[in-house]
Curated annotation (Swiss-Prot):
Keywords: Transferase. Its EC number is 2.5.1.18. One of its GO terms (molecular function) is glutathione transferase activity. GO terms for cellular component: extracellular region. The lineage of its organism: Eukaryota, Metazoa, Ecdysozoa, Arthropoda, Hexapoda. Homodimer. Belongs to the GST superfamily. Theta family. It comes from Anopheles gambiae. Residues 89-210 form the GST C-terminal domain. The keyword Transferase applies. It catalyses: RX + glutathione = an S-substituted glutathione + a halide anion + H(+). This is Glutathione S-transferase 1, isoform B. The keyword Transferase applies. Conjugation of reduced glutathione to a wide number of exogenous and endogenous hydrophobic electrophiles.
Amino acid sequence: MDFYYLPGSAPCRAVQMTAAAVGVELNLKLTDLMKGEHMKPEFLKLNPQHCVPTLVDNGFALWESRAIMCYLVEKYGKPCNNDSLYPTDPQKRAIVNQRLYFDMGTLYQRFGDYYYPQIFEGAPANETNFAKIGEALAFLDTFLEGERFVAGGNGYSLADISLYATLTTFEVAGYDFSAYVNVLRWYKSMPELIPASDTNRSWAEAARPFFDKVKH
């Protein structure tokens, strides 16, 4: 199973941890966006959106990290861990989906809105966008009130994996989220629970140079 990825990318790391959780071995294909490797004809044939992560499973190509994560669990997950990772109960699954969409459309989006213009465009820091990150973290802190996992329940889910990858990027970027006590408690507990969290951390370090000159 081929996995086209960039180490510093939180979505790529989330897929990598999901694969480890369901026991799938990935054939890693490092894709350097700075060198335009994602624009090569052979890659565009797989993924016309030319983005990573991209998974190719026996000729079946799929991109968007959360879609890939769900696919891996539904196809390769074992009954013993499936119901925690991506529950079959409609309401429990809906909560996991909601948290995944929260990560994609709110937390990770707001992180990108603040940091990426500074990194890639040399734009000045936007304090309004910075404040919106704090608001998103406050939402996550509320989700975790009285809960061990972001979607509740007795085991980590795909939502925990995705958000853990995102928060690892926050830490590497130098963003201090220690004021969000529930988030901090949860974040510190994840490395002992999520498989390949050590790889998540080491891969995330690849992004550190991009954040060195960004205002926090």
